A protein has these predicted regions:
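Short, glycine-/small- and polar/acidic-enriched structural segments
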Residues: 25-166, 173, 182-188, 211, ...
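Conserved C-terminal helix/tail region of periplasmic/extracytoplasmic solute-binding proteins
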Residues: 301-352
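Secondary-structure end/capping motifs
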Residues: 226-312
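Pocket-lining segment of extracytoplasmic ligand-binding domains
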Residues: 92, 165, 171-265
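Sec/Tat-exported extracytoplasmic proteins
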Residues: 56, 82, 87-90, 97-100, ...
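Short linear loop/turn motifs
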Residues: 63-64, 269-277, 314-326
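Bacterial N-terminal signal peptides that target proteins for export
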Residues: 1-11
Length: 352
């Protein structure tokens, strides 16, 4: 989900330039973007089925839900102010827009990876300890990199015990198909292909660190502050779709499967390793748990160690983060990432 450190540096520099003179205001039309991933497919169907139009109309606004083909590029465009909202993981929200000075609110924490990300090694019966001394192929500075480090920690190893080889998510499947590559870290759908390779072992997966790789819809904080209708419409549309999915609505699920390039069985297999919050009450329990702040502190530490919090970062606490209950971590004078439960509360209370 990340490209090179140079590209990241350029993106953060651009974000600082773009964000300084930008002032949000009340407006009537908004643009949000999403990319293909099991937990974000609902956004495409929310758009194509006109559910978003219904909710936007309720609040007197228009919301354009735009699919982009490149995940990192979608975040870059959001960070540069070209979109009001965007789907991204918790780590990427911290290290790209927030680190770039763009005050960002996690509006909907829709799901977390519960096996959609994994470390796969060639050979049967392998374990995490077998990684010692190996080359590990993965998209460097991504959630895959984070997952590897978490796995190594659990095995009593450290990143210095392996050699990380930067490999794009687009190339990871073909790389694993070569004899020289013995270990790869990937996310679905690439992970399912790699796991399908004969004589392999998944030695670690995101199911062993539940709730740490979170799939979110974020929005610009100032835009949301000036336009709460945007938050209400997005949240209302999302939970209407969650209701359809929970009820196994064939039309909705088939549309998502087709858009993701698979059939219904294939998409449902991906959903099995995606912990979707089908009700706002379930989401509330997750968002208000003290574990969320602990997870983000861990993510911030990893990000600081990798130099992902920007050149001015002197510690993992450089970026301030706010959580429900007015809980804060990091620098309160540099508050750039906020986890807001107010709109989910409205959904739970039926007041949207």
């Amino acid at each position: 989900m990340k490209k090179t450190p140079l590209l990241r540096s350029l993106v953060l520099s651009l974000a600082m330039l773009v964000s300084l003179p930008t002032f949000a205001a009340v407006k009537k039309e908004f643009n949000v973007c999403w990319t293909i991933y099991a937990g974000w497919m609902p956004w495409g169907t929310i758009s194509s089925s006109k559910i978003i139009d219904k909710w936007a109309s309720k609040y007197g606004i228009k919301i354009n839900v735009v699919q982009l083909n490149d995940y990192i590029e979608s975040i870059n465009q959001y960070t540069a102010g070209q979109f009001d909202g965007c789907t991204m993981t918790n780590m990427d929200a911290l290290t790209i827009p927030a680190a770039g000075g763009v005050d960002t609110t996690a509006l909907i924490l829709g799901s977390y990876s519960e096996g959609n990300d994994g470390v796969v090694m060639k050979g049967k019966g392998k374990t995490l300890k077998d990684l010692k001394g190996m080359k590990v192929y993965l998209p460097e500075l991504s959630v895959s990199h984070y997952l590897l480090v978490r796995g190594l920690e659990k095995a009593g190893l450290a990143e210095k015990d392996v050699t990380v080889v930067n490999t794009s998510d687009a190339d990871i499947v073909s790389a694993f198909g070569t004899a020289s590559v013995q270990v790869a870290v990937a996310w679905n759908p690439q992970l399912s292909v790699i796991k399908g390779t004969p004589n392999t072992t998944e030695v670690f997966s995101s199911s062993q660190v539940p709730g740490e790789l979170i799939d979110m819809m974020v929005v610009n904080t100032e835009t949301l502050k000036d336009n709460p209708a945007l938050g209400k419409a997005l949240t209302g549309a999302w939970y209407e779709m969650m209701g359809l999915m929970k009820a196994q609505d064939a039309s909705a699920l088939n549309a998502m499967a087709a858009a993701s390039g698979t059939d219904l069985a294939g998409y449902q297999a991906q959903l099995k390793t995606t912990h979707l919050f089908y009700t706002p009450h379930d989401n509330m329990a997750f968002v208000t748990s003290p574990d969320l702040a602990k997870t983000m502190q861990r993510v911030a530490s990893f990000s600081f160690d990798k130099g992902l919090l920007g050149e001015g970062a002197q510690s993992a606490d450089f970026i301030g983060m706010r959580f429900p209950g007015n809980v804060t971590v990091g620098d309160a004078s540099n508050m750039k990432l906020r986890f807001d439960d107010s709109f989910v509360k409205m959904a739970a209370a039926g007041t949207l």
